[in-house]
């Protein structure tokens, strides 16, 4: 039995998230369907670095699976690329040690959120970015983001549905890239993220850019450890990308 690590990208628009769910189309289900077919009906389970929600995309999701087939990683990559739908891409496949674990071995992740700042709605980007036709002061967003850097209890910045007991996470950096006059990308790097955390942080920073909240409001929300204390809305899923997963 050999363990394989794969880096995949996918367009989340047509999936009900990554994780297998009954009677719905998910990324995991499509990959496991292809692997099971390759293994002549024997079920093959796939483990990912983490789940993504309905409509969320991935540029660098990492998965692992075990196989007893005597084929090279390169052939696995080619076969899976052919046997999975066009909205999933296998960027790399490689053999890894048996103790590699896509989920428990992570030491950091990067998420990016794409904001389209056009006055007129662009129907061709509706599934891949948030349309935000309002004025934004990027300098205010950067000031606000500094209050979030470091180790904090992010209870106020995650969904009440978060299953983790500890809400303490470390944010290494938040960077802002103005790719052109219309596109703002916010990049979040940290040792881990809670359910809806990046989308809530994005909504908070957008409010800061409009002057609705101040850096002090963010500090107070962190100390309050109560999602109800924060007025910012959760940004919608379509602008969010799992960009990269890091391992030791």
Swiss-Prot record:
One of its GO terms (molecular function) is RNA binding. Gene3D superfamilies: Pseudouridine synthase I, catalytic domain, C-terminal subdomain, Pseudouridine synthase I, catalytic domain, N-terminal subdomain. The active site is at residue 53. InterPro entries: PsdUridine_synth_cat_dom_sf, PsdUridine_synth_TruA, PsdUridine_synth_TruA_a/b_dom, PsdUridine_synth_TruA_C, TruA/RsuA/RluB/E/F_N. GO terms for biological process: tRNA pseudouridine synthesis. Its EC number is 5.4.99.12. It catalyses: uridine(38/39/40) in tRNA = pseudouridine(38/39/40) in tRNA. Keywords: Isomerase, tRNA processing. Substrate binds at residue 111. Belongs to the tRNA pseudouridine synthase TruA family. Homodimer. Formation of pseudouridine at positions 38, 39 and 40 in the anticodon stem and loop of transfer RNAs. This is tRNA pseudouridine synthase A. It comes from Listeria monocytogenes serovar 1/2a (strain ATCC BAA-679 / EGD-e). The lineage of its organism: Bacteria, Bacillati, Bacillota, Bacilli, Bacillales. The gene is truA.
